[in-house]
Regions:
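Conserved pre-ATP/AMP-binding loop-to-beta segment of ANL
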Residues: 5-30, 37, 62-68
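Conserved AMP-binding A3 loop
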Residues: 26-52
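Active-site loops of AMP-binding adenylate-forming
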Residues: 45, 212-216, 224-242, 279-282, ...
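Conserved AMP-binding/adenylation subdomain of ANL enzymes
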Residues: 49-68, 75-182, 192
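Conserved ATP-binding/catalytic segment of the ANL
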Residues: 253, 259-319
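C-terminal boundary motif of the adenylate-forming
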Residues: 255, 298, 316, 337-364, ...
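Adenylate-forming
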Residues: 272, 306-333, 365-417, 437-439, ...
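Conserved C-terminal "lid"/linker of ANL adenylate-forming enzymes
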Residues: 343-345, 392-403, 424-493
């Protein structure tokens, strides 16, 4: 392939450029449609180019030389277009296109082949990478684990000792620690990765700290298809609870904030969509007369200008008592207290109190993406701490092993009582961090298998499909709300 234009090709390019106006539609993006039919977002040439340039300018302090990235997200996802196609064009990156089943269990295999220097991922992707790193550590020798523990402490301290929260000073201890953890990073294909982005949902502070301790800084961001992609990016790794500051060229405001300063996040700038294709009514609902795009996300701005995401308006749980509760905060706290839990889904709309559906971490079939009955190493280790030596979910829950034709409704889930007590203790700890009494979880249920794309609980970008999950497990939810069901989490905490 020629690396330079000959006169004829250049003339052809000029001719095509003259046929295109900056305000014409360049890209159609389908929204995820987790609560209904997807809408089609129209993005103009100007919106796309502006967003790429704003992103590029904002990440200036970080490495911007040509590198390697890997495309594995569905290309109808705006983040995939931005970080796996368009940004690489601007930076001159080499792009590896992953196996079509990368998100069904083959992600690590593809990362090992591509060896990217930068990567974009949704939180669940980083959770899976973290799990693989923990497995690699656990399977290493005692000396390696000892050195790794020291190295992670040094690396985390190196990042947090740096006042601006950017790249740490390259002291001798930092360099030695970095070399120690490089072995584990290489095992998951991130041996060369210098910069990672996280979007789609907030990445937990716990996960961010773990990746910093492995010398893998992850920059959180906030954006939307309707906003042309990214709108905020973390420029300081020390801001673990935020999604960063607003990018250059973007305006943000919090609409109708409550007493805590939380309200709907609204955005304005050149990146905003033209509208929804053939849906003028929804367009006017999204973009007001002053040009503000209403994101549907709830959050607040801290005094240092960082944006903090609380959750989605459509996911807000409104209890029978009229309390508006963002479930994401509660779910993240629960997962932080219970390392054996892969998914936590809070339920309580129009109910007197909150309950939570939990799944224990199990292995996933790389070929089909379906959950195995075998428990993940994190779960096995957690069970051993309870003096339980079972290695299968069916044994822990006393149900038949999962198969593609599995129907849990014919089974009664009776978890091991030691497990019930330990989960209750974890939820009690999480409840101590509740922002109000109404935000305390009072009952829980362990579900018969992990959430996956093939079983329907996760969408194509690995987001939980709340409405689908609540419908699928409606009988379990109703059982939790029966008065005869024991209150596992007491009101008097």
């Amino acid at each position: 392939m020629s690396l330079s234009f000959d006169p004829q090709l250049r003339q052809e390019l000029f001719f095509k450029e003259k046929q295109i106006a900056a305000n014409q539609c360049a890209l159609l993006i389908f929204t995820s449609g987790t609560t209904g039919l997807p809408k089609v977002v129209m993005l103009s040439h100007d919106a796309i180019v502006s967003n790429i340039k704003f992103c590029y300018a904002t990440v200036g302090p970080f490495r911007r030389e040509p590198g390697v990235t890997m495309s594995y997200l569905p290309l109808n996802h705006v983040a995939a277009q931005l970080f796996e196609v368009l940004m690489p064009l601007l930076c001159g990156d080499c792009v590896y296109f992953a196996d079509r089943d990368a998100l069904k269990g083959k992600l690590i295999k593809n990362l090992r082949i591509a060896q990217p220097t930068r990567l974009f991922g949704v939180p669940r992707v980083y959770e899976k990478i973290q799990e693989e790193l923990l497995v690699a550590e656990a399977n290493s020798s005692y000396l390696c684990r000892l050195l790794s523990s020291w190295a992670k402490r040094v690396l985390l301290k190196s990042y947090f000792c740096n006042a601006d929260g950017l790249e740490p000073k390259r002291t001798l201890s930092y360099i030695c620690a970095s070399l120690i953890v490089r072995k584990f990073k290489a095992q998951v294909g991130l041996g060369r990765c210098a910069y990672l982005w996280a979007g789609g949902a907030p990445l937990s502070a716990q996960a961010k700290k773990y990746f910093l301790s492995m010398d893998i800084p992850v920059a959180d961001m906030f954006g939307a298809s309707e906003a042309g992609g990214a709108m905020t990016i973390t420029r300081s790794y020390c801001h673990l609870e935020s999604s960063g500051r607003v990018m250059l060229g973007i305006e943000v405001k919090i609409d109708k904030p409550n007493e805590q300063g939380q309200g709907e996040i609204c955005l304005r700038g050149r990146c905003i969509m033209m509208g929804y294709l053939n849906n003028e009514e929804k367009t006017h609902e999204c973009i007001d007369s002053d040009g503000w795009m209403h994101s549907g996300d709830v959050g607040h701005l801290s005094t240092d200008g960082c944006l903090h995401i609380t959750g989605r308006i459509k996911d807000i749980v409104i209890t029978a008592g009229g309390e508006n509760i963002p479930p994401l905060y509660i779910e993240n706290r629960i997962k932080a207290e219970l390392p054996c839990v892969s998914n936590a889904l809070v339920v309580g709309d129009k109910r007197k109190f909150l309950v939570v559906l939990l799944t224990l971490k199990t292995d996933i079939d790389n070929a089909t993406g379906l959950p195995f009955d075998t428990l993940h190493l994190d779960t096995v280790s957690w069970l051993k701490s309870l003096d339980i030596h079972q290695t299968r979910l069916s044994e822990v829950l006393n149900i038949p092993a999962f198969t593609p034709s599995f129907d849990y409704k014919g089974s009664v889930i009776k978890p091991n009582q030691k497990v019930v007590a330990a989960v209750e203790a974890g939820l009690t700890r999480a409840n101590k961090n509740a922002l109000s009494r109404a935000q305390r979880v009072q009952k829980f249920a362990l579900l018969p298998h992990d959430f996956t794309v093939p079983t329907g609980e996760l969408g194509p970008t690995l987001k939980s499909r709340r409405a689908f999950i609540c419908e699928k497990y409606a009988d379990i939810i109703e059982e939790l709300y029966k008065e005869s069901s024991r209150l596992l989490i007491k009101n008097d905490l």
